């Protein structure tokens, strides 16, 4: 294992820090810290501290200018709309906020979140057919869908409208429908929104187009803050502004289910911060989709019934305790498996570990902990019969998405980000996948100092 840490101190040119101190009107300690982080323009520093200019025009976000009139038409015609989300905290928050926002605008809307263990990740052809049979005539995805080409084609065949909102990386081809995503069209000035942040920007544009009361946006900004922090997107630019506003809203105690969950998690809403969301709230919301079905988390966020809120918050708290126990067991087994690898495999700079009996909803968090120990990009695969469901985590120096692309011929499905991704692989291909991934990672990381930076 790679051990030890390296100390990296960014330079602080005294002239730059002094200029920031004087022209931005800030203290020397803050000026030094900002200089070390690359800030040099007093005007930029002032905008960063006041967050002026951090909120961007939603019409620049992918195909938002096309999607918004489609939504307006669906609302006016009372077209049945389904918001198709994902089972993590970001996806659940995005589903809740868009359902609440559309309902406030008069839409006939229902949520749909797939099961991790049945439908799996993303918009599936079967889901499109099921929603069509249930009367849905417009599907809006949140936090997923950017690679769902077959599902988009099936929606078109059935006459079901489709709008995709997503923040994940896409392949060479895109689904044939309006796509609202920071990575699409290249016109949006900020590329690191989470799924809920992306859905919020679409709602922001829709509220303006409908000339509706902007308090609709205030009512869901708390969900954007939770998702932004829980999904670990950078807290800069628009993310920072949205998270700050959302944390303030949480402190006002406006969402019943969240208020109850905070009490159970022993978090004081009046002084809530990103740490409390990341370590107390996010894991409890994620636990539902990891171990059972994310509907419990969604219902908690949307309920107005005190009894239901208490029951659901207790359920999520119990699931989170179960998740921790399962996680600890898998971590022990994964590290033992790594230690049993031949020395030549341990020397390679990419790791794939797999086993029967591992919980597919937990392997992602365990992969993060393995990365902390071995300092290599790691994919953990939970085997179930002839297929395995895996999740990977990476280091700053390695693009996991590109690493999986190098193994695409061995994978059934894959997708995600530079730092985190998911895979489906046939059991018979796991060994070949492990070799190919390790070889690619070794090629890309040879000579790179993999010790964590302090």
Question: PLM features: what roles do these ranges have?
Answer:
Residues 131-134, 141, 145-233, 239, ...:
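Conserved phosphate-handling catalytic cores of large alpha/beta enzymes
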Residues 447-449:
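Short, structured loop/turn "capping" segments at alpha-beta junctions
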Residues 5:
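Catalytic domains of riboflavin
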Residues 2, 10, 14, 19-137, ...:
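Hydrophobic helix-and-loop "lid/oligomerization" segment in the mid-to-C-terminal part
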Residues 451-454:
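Short, intrinsically disordered, charge-balanced linker/junction segments flanking boundaries
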């Amino acid at each position: 294992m790679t051990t030890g840490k390296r100390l990296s101190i960014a330079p602080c040119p005294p002239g730059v820090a002094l200029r920031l101190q004087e022209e931005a009107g800030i203290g020397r300690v803050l000026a030094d810290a900002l200089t070390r982080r690359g800030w040099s323009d007093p005007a930029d520093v002032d905008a960063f501290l006041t967050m002026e200019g951090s909120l961007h025009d939603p019409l620049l976000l992918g195909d938002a200018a096309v999607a918004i009139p489609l939504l307006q038409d669906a609302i006016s015609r009372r077209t049945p709309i389904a918001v198709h989300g994902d089972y993590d905290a970001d996806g659940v928050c995005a589903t809740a906020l868009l359902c609440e926002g559309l309902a406030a605008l008069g839409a006939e809307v229902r949520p749909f979140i797939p099961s991790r263990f049945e439908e799996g990740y993303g918009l599936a052809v079967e889901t499109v057919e099921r929603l069509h049979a249930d009367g849905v005539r417009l599907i809006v995805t949140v936090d997923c869908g950017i690679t769902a080409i077959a599902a988009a084609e099936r929606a078109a065949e059935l006459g079901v409208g489709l709008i995709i909102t997503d923040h994940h990386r896409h392949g060479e081809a895109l689904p044939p429908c309006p796509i609202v995503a920071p990575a699409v069209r290249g016109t949006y000035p900020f590329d690191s929104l989470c799924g809920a942040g992306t859905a919020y920007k679409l709602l922001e544009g829709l509220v303006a187009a409908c000339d509706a009361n902007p308090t609709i946006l205030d009512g869901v900004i708390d969900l954007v803050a939770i998702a932004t922090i829980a999904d670990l997107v950078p807290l800069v630019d628009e993310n920072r502004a949205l998270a700050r506003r959302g944390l303030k809203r949480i402190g006002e105690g406006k969402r019943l289910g969240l208020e109850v969950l905070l009490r159970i998690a022993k978090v004081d809403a009046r002084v809530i911060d990103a740490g409390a969301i990341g370590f107390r709230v996010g894991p409890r919301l994620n636990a539902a989709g990891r171990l059972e079905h994310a509907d419990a988390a969604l219902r908690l966020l949307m309920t107005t019934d005190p009894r239901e809120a208490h029951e659901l918050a207790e359920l999520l708290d119990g699931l989170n305790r179960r998740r921790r126990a399962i996680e600890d067991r898998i971590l022990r087994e994964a590290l033992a498996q790594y230690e049993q690898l031949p020395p030549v495999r341990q020397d390679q700079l990419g790791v794939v570990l797999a086993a029967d009996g591992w919980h597919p909803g937990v392997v992602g968090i365990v992969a993060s902990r393995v990365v902390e120990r071995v300092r290599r990009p790691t994919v953990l695969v939970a085997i179930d019969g002839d297929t395995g469901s895996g999740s990977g985590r990476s280091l700053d120096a390695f693009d996991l998405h590109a690493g999986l692309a190098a193994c695409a011929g061995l994978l059934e499905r894959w997708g995600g980000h530079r730092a985190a991704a998911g895979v489906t692989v046939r059991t018979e291909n796991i060994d070949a996948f492990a070799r190919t991934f390790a070889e690619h990672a070794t090629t890309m990381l040879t000579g790179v100092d993999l010790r964590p930076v302090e």
